[in-house]
UniProtKB/Swiss-Prot annotation:
Organism the protein comes from: Clostridium acetobutylicum (strain ATCC 824 / DSM 792 / JCM 1419 / IAM 19013 / LMG 5710 / NBRC 13948 / NRRL B-527 / VKM B-1787 / 2291 / W)
Reactions the enzyme catalyzes: L-seryl-[protein] + ATP = O-phospho-L-seryl-[protein] + ADP + H(+); L-threonyl-[protein] + ATP = O-phospho-L-threonyl-[protein] + ADP + H(+)
High-level lineage: Bacteria, Bacillati, Bacillota, Clostridia, Eubacteriales
Pfam families documented for this protein: HATPase_c_2
Gene Ontology molecular function: ATP binding; protein serine kinase activity; protein serine/threonine kinase activity; sigma factor antagonist activity
GO terms, biological process: asexual sporulation; negative regulation of sporulation resulting in formation of a cellular spore; sporulation resulting in formation of a cellular spore
Identification of the protein by name: Anti-sigma F factor
Record key words, sorted: ATP-binding, Kinase, Nucleotide-binding, Serine/threonine-protein kinase, Sporulation, Transferase
EC number: 2.7.11.1
């Protein structure tokens, strides 16, 4: 049963990354998360949005869309861009790999997302964009 859903669209500008992170964290707050859980979500969203801006659009602008759904204490977050896409998803997800060494990127974005979320899936088509789907189950805290 679908409990709640939100969609957010914003320009692919680095100054919007913190707005996106806080918006998704606020949406997830209805699950009464621990501080650790909310920090995990913020970090993962931050990395996904930054990837869309820097790698998807190569800092040239575009629109990033975030859809978030809460169902059975699980938060599903989709971060989508219509940028250049990822040629080799498996390679892109390797720790320390970056398509932009000129920007001194660490290549840890997907690794960070994987460490903070329960599940991550990447769908991409060269020239059409990328969708990152992340899931996190929230513990039920009893008083």
């Amino acid at each position: 049963m679908l409990e709640n859903k939100m969609e957010l669209k914003f320009l692919a500008k680095s100054e919007n990354e913190s707005f996106a992170r806080v918006t998704v964290a606020s949406f997830a707050s209805e699950l009464d998360p621990t501080l650790e859980e909310i920090d995990d979500v913020k970090m993962a969203v931050s990395e996904a949005v930054t990837n869309a801006i820097i790698h998807g659009y190569e800092n040239k602008g575009g629109v990033v869309t975030i859809c978030a759904v809460i169902e059975d204490r699980e938060l599903t977050i989709e971060v989508m861009d219509e940028g250049i896409g990822i040629e080799n998803i498996e390679k892109a997800m390797e720790p320390l790999y970056t398509s932009r060494p000129d920007l001194e990127r660490s290549g840890m974005g997907f690794t960070v997302m994987e460490s903070f979320m329960d599940n991550i899936k990447v769908e991409s088509e060269k020239g059409k964009g990328t969708k990152i789907i992340m899931k996190k189950k929230f513990a039920l805290i009893e008083d």
